[in-house]
């Protein structure tokens, strides 16, 4: 391969249709929904058989520490996280990545493999072989989209109509693109299934940095102009690449399909059957999951009796069901969702209601993730003025309290060893040892071994 192949992972979605597990501050791409690792990690790991460079991940600034931690677990953290201060859709996001890669590879023309972070692929070998087959077309200057062989009439996806076949084998086919089709109605989708020339538009792409910038400059020079100005003012912060919000917010919002793929004369489509799913709803996870003899997909401490064809998940605590069928039941530490499987697309209406009601359950989980670890709000009472949190600090990290003058603290080490600095005094705390921290005193916590969990009781409310 003459050109470096660089995965560009789009990780900016909120996944509201998978509430209550997916939330604004911890959306579905960071969850372990279909594997023992997160969807973001799966997206990167399934490329292991390809000779790729370190991935570039584009994400919301709010999710930066989650992305960094998940990349660190894969040993893929390499100053490669681009932080979007505001979402401007896929065309500008990919443009920013292309301009940064052009800067980093001044004497090369890397290939960008653009992938959403939250898709599921069952046939990984076929997927990778199809990418390999598409590389020569991208190196020749084509813009490659990846089409999925449809398994049913689907009104939630766009379609690609293929034209003249350029290359094929038993597992893949590369063709000219005849047209892109917007999300159809059911009757039209049913007609597509009867033909062998329509494929789901997967939202995955392969092209060189230069060709994407050339085509975007041709059709949307306004986007390129703002992105160029943004990249001139990027700021490197640890493993993050920060964009100037004042500049980037002026960028028009546009998808790559509208901006480039539907207009370019050099689009080709690599079609494949890879067991693909965009995991857009709980019903998708029921379809993907391993079912018991009654057709149920269950995760967690669950007892089922006379229960059929249901998806049941519990994050904490026992869930028991009797005499139900075709339901989705999702139980988290602070919320419970019960829905018919054929109605779960409407969970977004619940999220909108929570937002309009000023609630927080659609935004954050009870347990939140920080740069230094995580914090679980176990219990609280405004009436009795206390709050109990379980704080877990990562190895070699420091936790510094955002102290408030009226707050008193009692800290208990549940597991591990910690060095606690209270004002100027240093204390070493081991398991089951506690310390009292008076109101208004600065304090910080440093971990001395691999795992430490600290339980803190507060008499006022304060953020971690």
From Swiss-Prot:
Pfam family, one: MannoseP_isomer
Record EC number: 2.7.7.13
Keyword Metal-binding part of the UniProt annotation: no
Catalytic function, reaction form: alpha-D-mannose 1-phosphate + GTP + H(+) = GDP-alpha-D-mannose + diphosphate
Residue spans crossing the bilayer: none
Classification via SUPFAM superfamilies: Nucleotide-diphospho-sugar transferases (SSF53448), RmlC-like cupins (SSF51182)
GO biological process, one term: O antigen biosynthetic process
UniProt keywords, alphabetically: GTP-binding, Lipopolysaccharide biosynthesis, Nucleotide-binding, Nucleotidyltransferase, Transferase
Pathway where this protein functions: Nucleotide-sugar biosynthesis; GDP-alpha-D-mannose biosynthesis; GDP-alpha-D-mannose from alpha-D-mannose 1-phosphate (GTP route): step 1/1; Bacterial outer membrane biogenesis; LPS O-antigen biosynthesis
General function of this protein: Involved in GDP-mannose biosynthesis which serves as the activated sugar nucleotide precursor for mannose residues in cell surface polysaccharides. This enzyme participates in synthesis of the LPS O7 antigen.
Name of the protein in question: Mannose-1-phosphate guanylyltransferase
Organism of origin: Escherichia coli
């Amino acid at each position: 391969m003459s050109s470096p192949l660089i995965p560009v992972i789009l990780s900016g979605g909120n996944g509201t249709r998978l509430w209550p597990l997916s939330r604004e501050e911890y959306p579905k791409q960071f969850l372990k929904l279909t594997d023992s690792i997160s969807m973001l990690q799966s997206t990167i790991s399934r490329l292991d058989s390809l000779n790729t460079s370190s991935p570039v991940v584009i994400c919301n600034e709010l999710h930066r520490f989650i992305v960094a931690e998940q990349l660190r677990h894969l040993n893929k953290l390499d100053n490669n996280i681009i932080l979007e201060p505001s979402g401007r859709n896929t065309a500008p996001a990919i443009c920013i990545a292309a301009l940064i890669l052009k800067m980093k590879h001044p004497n090369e023309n890397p290939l960008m493999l653009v992938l959403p972070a939250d898709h599921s692929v069952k046939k990984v070998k076929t997927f990778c072989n199809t990418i390999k087959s598409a590389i020569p077309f991208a190196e020749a200057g084509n813009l490659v989209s990846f089409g999925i062989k449809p398994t049913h009439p689907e009104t939630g996806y766009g379609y690609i109509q293929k034209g003249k076949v350029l290359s094929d084998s038993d597992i893949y086919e590369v063709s000219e693109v005849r047209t892109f089709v917007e999300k159809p109605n059911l009757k039209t989708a049913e007609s597509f299934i009867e033909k062998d020339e329509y494929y789901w538009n997967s939202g995955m792409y392969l092209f060189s940095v230069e060709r994407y910038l050339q085509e975007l400059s041709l059709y949307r020079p306004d986007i390129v102009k703002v992105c160029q100005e943004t990249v001139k003012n990027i700021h490197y912060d640890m493993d993050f690449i920060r964009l100037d919000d004042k500049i980037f917010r002026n960028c028009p919002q546009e998808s790559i399909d509208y901006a480039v793929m539907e207009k370019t004369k050099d689009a080709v489509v690599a079609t494949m059957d890879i067991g693909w799913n965009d995991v857009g709803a709980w019903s998708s996870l029921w379809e993907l999951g391993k079912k018991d003899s009654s057709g149920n997909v269950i995760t967690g401490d669950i007892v089922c009796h006379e229960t059929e064809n249901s998806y049941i998940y519990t994050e904490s605590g026992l869930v028991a069901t009797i005499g139900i069928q075709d339901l989705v039941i999702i139980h988290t530490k602070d919320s419970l969702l019960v829905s018919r499987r054929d109605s779960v697309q409407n969970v977004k209406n619940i999220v909108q209601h929570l937002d309009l009601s000023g609630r927080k359950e659609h935004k954050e989980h009870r347990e939140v993730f920080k740069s230094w670890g995580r914090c679980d709000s176990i219990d609280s009472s405004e009436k009795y003025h206390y709050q109990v949190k379980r704080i877990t600090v990562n190895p070699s990290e420091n936790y510094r309290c955002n102290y408030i003058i009226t707050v008193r603290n009692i800290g208990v080490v549940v597991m591990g060893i910690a060095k606690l600095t209270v004002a100027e005094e240093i204390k070493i705390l081991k398991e089951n040892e506690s310390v009292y921290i008076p109101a208004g005193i600065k304090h910080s916590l440093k971990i001395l071994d691999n795992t430490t969990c600290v339980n803190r009781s507060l008499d006022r409310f304060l953020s971690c």
